[in-house]
C-alpha cells in the first residue's frame, strides 16, 4: 500500500469521525453564580440572626410568588400553553417571573420547549445524562452544544412573539424589569416601610431569595431526572418526586409531565398540598383570569401507564382498557399543546376546563 493510499484512508476515517464537542466556558455566568451563592448564604446568616421577622416573612412570600411566576407563568402558560390567561393574569405572572431572576420569559419558555422536544439528548440544554451538576446549573457555565442551537430553530415560537407582555418584558428586561423589580424594589420595601437596614434587606429579600428560587427550580432539571419512579414512561429519564413537588409548588411529578406536557396540573392528581400552582390556577379560573385549562382523561392515562409505565402505578379498574401493547421504545416527545407532532388521538383525549372563546 502506497503512502498516498494510507494518507487518503486516514483522511477518510478522520472525516467520518463525529466532531468532538469542546467546552467553551461562559465566565460571566460562572462569576455571577459564585457571587449569587456567596451573597445568598450571607443573606441566610442575616435572616437567622439580624433581620427583623417581618423581613424574613416578606422574603419567604417573595420566594413563593417568584416560584409561581416560574411554574404558573413561564412554565405552564408560556412554555406549554397548558391554559390561557387574560391580560391581568399575564401581567401579574410577568412580575412574579421577574422576581425569580431566571432571565426573561421568552428565553425561559423557548429553551424549555427545546428541552421537552429533545429531552436528555445533546439537543437538550440541560441534558441529565451529562450528570447531576451539569443538569442542575453546569449547563449555564459552558456554551450550548451545537445540537441545541440547531434544534432550537425547528420549534415554533410564534405564539410568544404575538404576546405583548412577553415581548415588552424581553425588550426591557435588562434595563428595567430585572434591576428595578428583581433587585432594587424587594430590598427597598422593607427599608422604607418598617425601617429594616437596606443592606440587610438586600441580602435577605433579594440575594437569598434569588439563590433559593434558582436552586429550587433547578432541582427539577437535576434531581427529578435521576431519582424516583417512572410510572408513566419508563423509557425516559424524568421521574416522580414528591419532595421536589412540595418544594417547587407542583413540578416534581416530572415523569407525568414529560409524558403529558400540556396538562395544566403537571401531575395526575393535582392535590394542592403538593401542587400549590394548581390551586393558584384553579382560583384564577374561578375569577375568570385563567381559562381553557387542559388536562388528560383517566382512560388516556391508564392506556399510557399500561403501555410504557414501570409498573409502580396501579389502577383499580383496568379491565376496560383494551388492545394495550407493551412498547419498549422512546415515544415521540412533545413540548406541549400546539406541537405539530401531537397525534389527533391524543388531542381527542384531552379535557379542557373552563373553556371560553378568546
From Swiss-Prot:
The chain crosses the membrane at residues 30-50, 55-75, 175-195, 200-220. A motif (Histidine box-2) lies at residues 112-116. Fe cation 2 binds at residues 115, 225, 254, 258. A motif (Histidine box-3) lies at residues 254-258. It is an enzyme of class 1 (oxidoreductase). It catalyses: (9Z)-octadecenoyl-CoA + 2 Fe(II)-[cytochrome b5] + O2 + 2 H(+) = (9Z,12Z)-octadecadienoyl-CoA + 2 Fe(III)-[cytochrome b5] + 2 H2O; (9Z)-hexadecenoyl-CoA + 2 Fe(II)-[cytochrome b5] + O2 + 2 H(+) = (9Z,12Z)-hexadecadienoyl-CoA + 2 Fe(III)-[cytochrome b5] + 2 H2O. It is found in: Membrane. A motif (Histidine box-1) lies at residues 75-80. One of its GO terms (biological process) is unsaturated fatty acid biosynthetic process. One of its GO terms (cellular component) is endoplasmic reticulum membrane. Its cofactor is Fe(2+). Keywords: Fatty acid biosynthesis, Fatty acid metabolism, Iron, Lipid biosynthesis, Lipid metabolism, Membrane, Metal-binding, Oxidoreductase, Transmembrane, Transmembrane helix. Fe cation 1 binds at residues 75, 80, 112, 116, 257. Catalyzes the formation of a Delta12 double bond, acting on monounsaturated fatty acyl substrates like palmitoleoyl-CoA ((9Z)-hexadecenoyl-CoA) and oleoyl-CoA ((9Z)-octadecenoyl-CoA) with higher desaturation activity on (9Z)-octadecenoyl-CoA than (9Z)-hexadecenoyl-CoA. Requires preexisting cis double bond at the Delta9 position of fatty acyls to be able to insert the Delta12 double bond. This is Acyl-CoA Delta-12 desaturase. It comes from Tribolium castaneum (Red flour beetle).
Amino acid at each position: 500500500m502506497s503512502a498516498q493510499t494510507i494518507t487518503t484512508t486516514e483522511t477518510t476515517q478522520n472525516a467520518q469521525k463525529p466532531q468532538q464537542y469542546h467546552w467553551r466556558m461562559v465566565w460571566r455566568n460562572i462569576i455571577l453564580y459564585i457571587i449569587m451563592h456567596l451573597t445568598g448564604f450571607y443573606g441566610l446568616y442575616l435572616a437567622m440572626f439580624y433581620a427583623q421577622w417581618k423581613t424574613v416573612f416578606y422574603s419567604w412570600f417573595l420566594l413563593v410568588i417568584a416560584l409561581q411566576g416560574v411554574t404558573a407563568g413561564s412554565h405552564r402558560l408560556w412554555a406549554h400553553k397548558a391554559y390561557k390567561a387574560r391580560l391581568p393574569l399575564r401581567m401579574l405572572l410577568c412580575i412574579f417571573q421577574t422576581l425569580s431572576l431566571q432571565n426573561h420569559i421568552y428565553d425561559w419558555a423557548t429553551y424549555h420547549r427545546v428541552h421537552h422536544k429533545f429531552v436528555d439528548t445533546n439537543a437538550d440544554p440541560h441534558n441529565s445524562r451529562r450528570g447531576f451538576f451539569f443538569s442542575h446549573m453546569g449547563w449555564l457555565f459552558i456554551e450550548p452544544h451545537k445540537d441545541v442551537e440547531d434544534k432550537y430553530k425547528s420549534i415554533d415560537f410564534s405564539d410568544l412573539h404575538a404576546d405583548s407582555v412577553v415581548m415588552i418584558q424581553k425588550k426591557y428586561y435588562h434595563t428595567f424589569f430585572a434591576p428595578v423589580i428583581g433587585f432594587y424594589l424587594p430590598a427597598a420595601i422593607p427599608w422604607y416601610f418598617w425601617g429594616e437596614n437596606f443592606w440587610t434587606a438586600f441580602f435577605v429579600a433579594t440575594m437569598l431569595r434569588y439563590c433559593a428560587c434558582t436552586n429550587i427550580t433547578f432541582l427539577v432539571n437535576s434531581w427529578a431526572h435521576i431519582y424516583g419512579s417512572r410510572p408513566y414512561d419508563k423509557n425516559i429519564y424524568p421521574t416522580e418526586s414528591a419532595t421536589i413537588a412540595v418544594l417547587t409548588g407542583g413540578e416534581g411529578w416530572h415523569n407525568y409531565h414529560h409524558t403529558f406536557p400540556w396538562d395544566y396540573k403537571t401531575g395526575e392528581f393535582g392535590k394542592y398540598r403538593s401542587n400549590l400552582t394548581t390551586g393558584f390556577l384553579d382560583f384564577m379560573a374561578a375569577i375568570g383570569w385563567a381559562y381553557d385549562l387542559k388536562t388528560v382523561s383517566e382512560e388516556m392515562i391508564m392506556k399510557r401507564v399500561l403501555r410504557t409505565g414501570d409498573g409502580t402505578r396501579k389502577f383499580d379498574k383496568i379491565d376496560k382498557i383494551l388492545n394495550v401493547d407493551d412498547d419498549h421504545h422512546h415515544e415521540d416527545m412533545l413540548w406541549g399543546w400546539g406541537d405539530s407532532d401531537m397525534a389527533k388521538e391524543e388531542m381527542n383525549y384531552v379535557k379542557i376546563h373552563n373553556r371560553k372563546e378568546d
